[in-house]
Design a protein with these regions (language model features):
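Single conserved hydrophobic/aromatic residue that forms the stacking wall/gate
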Residues: 1-12
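Conserved P-loop NTPase nucleotide-binding/switch module
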Residues: 165-209, 213-214, 223-253
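Flexible beta-alpha connector loops of hexameric P-loop NTPases
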Residues: 124, 134-155, 187-202
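N-terminal pre-Walker A segment at the start of P-loop NTPase domains
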Residues: 34-67
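Glycine-rich phosphate-binding P-loop
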Residues: 67-95
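AAA+/P-loop NTPase substrate/partner-engagement loops
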Residues: 96-135
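Conserved alpha-helical scaffold flanking the Walker A/P-loop in AAA+ ATPase domains
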Residues: 153-165
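Conserved NTP phosphate-binding and transfer environment spanning the P-loop NTPase/kinase superfamily
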Residues: 211-217, 223-413
């Protein structure tokens, strides 16, 4: 078995957390990959270089002093023309929660290890999630403080994803506008005049991102390419220009009419305040009814001779994975295609064993947080043996806390 070295990442990330940064990328890092199906670095690519205004030096164990770009807490916008490296940079950041093999090129791209890559997931299930900070006053009168659906729209799935990430303890959201639901992210001024706020149940993410940081301590790094509205909310704006990083924060402030303190001169939409969700929802694994195996034999056994026979016992669930994107628990599929920070199928197999344990042994009144806490506490005490019946198979890698939440949230059973 192998683990993805959360402790190692935490050791490297310690100076980052102490300085209130959410990410760090060392000069000389190679961010592009050889191809879309390869983890090898692209040969001949432009090495990463930090802009002077964001250059910092940290001292790391076994590395000494390392210079690169520090991304501070708050709201950071990544912009630039198509094919200039915006999504490549974000992908490097989303994988910066893990240690990298030497020669990967991204060994010193380090991200807050609670970071969650967020995207729209049309068709996913949502169970008992309080999405009222984003969606309210539905035409059918449905309660959005405890919302469930087996077929979420893009905007609903992304709203649920934010709240589930908060429940999982994230300190950083990573979002690419290209893979997001447009109506969840932003509503321009003209649309707001045509369709009044009273007729629109969705409060877009742009109107909550500041409060998420100031009230919940959750920063955002957002790749944007089509809407300039995000400029008004950003603390820092970086431009990818032919794979080079340029800090254009002051330029954007001047264009948007902000003063030197970052205060908006232009009038902004006033959004109603919201209450932080209470994370006490019941775990989908709680109260799961297990199938029972009849241990008595039809003929020749004690039961066949009218004896009492052995007691019936619960049947162990079968687990199976299909690559890193799907796992099966008996006949129930859990779709993890859009859980983008899963590194490989070994983590998916570990998630399958964790889910089987919860479905077979979870307490009926257990909350989602209690379920995840039980898994992690048991793993620390007993390791893989606690989750594997009989023997521990090869090919297991420990997933992060955030991915354990993700598989629980996507279980439909």
């Amino acid at each position: 078995t192998r683990s993805y070295g959360v402790t190692g990442v935490q050791t490297c990330a310690l100076p980052i957390l102490e300085r209130q940064w959410v990410a760090f990328a060392a000069n000389g890092s190679v961010l592009p990959r050889k191809s879309g199906v390869s983890e090898l670095p692209m040969t001949g690519s432009v090495p990463f270089t930090a802009p002077d205004s964001m250059t910092e030096t940290v001292e790391l164990p076994h590395r000494g002093k390392v210079t690169g770009m520090a991304v501070p807490e708050g709201i950071t916008l990544i912009v630039g023309g198509g094919y200039h490296g915006k999504s490549t940079f974000l992908e490097a950041l989303q994988n910066g929660v893990y240690n990298h093999i030497g020669g990967d090129g991204r060994e010193l791209v380090i991200t807050d290890n609670t970071a969650v890559k967020l995207r729209a997931e049309d068709g996913r299930s949502v169970r008992n999630v309080d999405i009222s900070m984003f969606i309210n006053d539905l035409p059918n009168g449905r309660d959005t403080t405890c919302f469930s659906t087996m077929d979420a729209s893009g905007s609903t799935s992304q709203a649920a994803g934010v709240v589930e990430s908060m429940e999982a303890g994230t300190r950083l959201l990573l979002i690419d506008e290209d893979t997001s639901a447009t109506n969840f992210m932003v509503r321009d001024a003209l649309m707001q005049r045509v369709i009044s706020r009273e007729k629109e149940p969705i409060t877009p993410f742009i109107e909550r991102m500041r409060a998420l940081y100031e009230q919940a301590g959750i920063s955002t790094i957002l790749v944007a390419g089509s809407s300039g509205a995000f400029f008004y909310e950003a603390d820092r704006v970086i431009q990818m220009d032919r794979y080079h990083v340029v800090d254009i924060t002051e330029k954007v402030r001047n264009i948007c009419g902000q003063n030197a303190c970052g205060q908006h001169v232009m009038e902004q939409v006033q959004t109603a305040a919201f209450e932080m969700p209470v994370f006490d929802r019941k775990s989908p694994a709680a109260g799961h009814k297990r199938e029972v195996t009849d241990t008595g034999r039809e003929r020749g056994g004690r039961r066949g001779r009218h004896g009492s026979g052995a007691a019936d016992r619960p049947r162990t669930m079968k687990v199976k994975i299909m690559g890193k994107e799907m796992l099966m628990l008996d006949k129930e599929n859990v779709d993890l295609r859009y859980t983008e920070q899963l590194a490989d199928s070994e983590q998916t197999m570990a998630l399958a064993y964790f889910m089987r344990y919860l479905l077979e042994k979870a307490k009926s009144a257990q909350t989602v947080r209690e379920s995840v806490s039980e898994i992690e506490t048991l793993f620390e005490k007993k390791g893989w043996q606690a989750f594997c019946s009989g023997y521990v198979p090869c090919g297991l890698a420990r997933p992060r806390t955030q991915e354990i939440y993700a598989v629980l949230n996507r279980y439909r059973g």
